[in-house]
Amino acid sequence: MFREAREQNKKLILGLIHLRPMPGTPYYIDGDYEKSIKKAVFDAKALENGGAAGCLIQTVDKVYPSGDDTDYVRVACMSIIASEVRKNVGQDFKIGVQIMWNCITPSLAVAKSVNGDFTRCTALVGTTTSPFGTLEADPLKVFEYRKKIETESVDMIAEIAGYHFKSGYDEDTLLGLVQSANMIGASAVEIMHRDEEINNQMEAAIRASFPHMPIVLGGGTDVASAKSRLRNADAALVGRCFEDGNWGSGINEKTVAAYMKEVNSI
């Protein structure tokens, strides 16, 4: 998916669908699950109609495990939600799933159940901090499970600098993480820096050393900055912008269309 887009010089724009808290989590209230289904379908259609390439369905439970495993009910409910999205969009619309904070193997299981296209991995390589504890990558476990359930076709984005993977910006550290991600077979690397100049420097450094590695921007773009920030990147995950600045609310189809107009002019 991501490598094909890079080879074809396409920009994949993927909207974030932020769900309500899942059953079995501390902040779940009765009705949240049903609201999540309706919201996911609505947001996916808004993205599709606005011209985005796909979506990333993401749990928003407020409190998360720091390890890779999670409660069965989160996996089951996420599978149903993603399945409902799959039923309501065209076959070319890309669907990604991410059970936060770093539940990679459960996310792969969901992707398997709905013929999903990709997942996003907070810590596929390296070590990072989070509000919920230290995250230690375990790529051997991930790739053994991926092979076991035959999800090699599910692309995996490795976060190496951004919202969830905290590494700052040191070029040697950054490129070391790209090297690790490339070595184990990540489909793309994700970066994000709020300072656009630094963000573009990071893109340039990766592109110079790893010209074939797809780069995903993990945030920080809006309609005004999409063209300049995406010039050297291959894809973007877009959340708050498509929600008109109201994080976690519904996606505005018109905003998606305006963003895509800028991207298509690159």
Named regions from a protein language model:
Residues 2-19:
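Glycine-rich, aromatic-flanked loop segments that form ligand/cofactor-binding clefts
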Residues 96-99, 216-218:
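Short beta-strand elements of ligand-binding domains
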Residues 248-250:
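A charged, well-structured terminal subsegment
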